[in-house]
């Protein structure tokens, strides 16, 4: 299975604990391709939700219906970034639009204080 940064995959995030995103849902691959190209057993992702929040500019990045083959308006939950086992990844559904990559990078840098 080949995984690439900024692809959107369906992943089974169950079981979920507390405020973690659970269910089978889309996730955005944010892990560097340096790791994706080797046989690494886990992948860093941001879950995607259809529970869109209008005023969460740092915590979320909005994806419009139709982007990356998503069937509804969605938010990438930057604050829910985590590593998952590759066995949780079910299938690729699309790619993040290029114009949103910098926004994702900036928000991750803010969330984990890399600036």
Which residues make up each language-model segment?
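C-terminal terminal-subdomain/extension
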Residues: 1, 66-115
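Feature marks short, surface-exposed loop/turn motifs that line or immediately flank catalytic pockets
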Residues: 17, 52, 84
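Compact nucleic-acid interaction/catalytic patches
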Residues: 20-24, 28-65
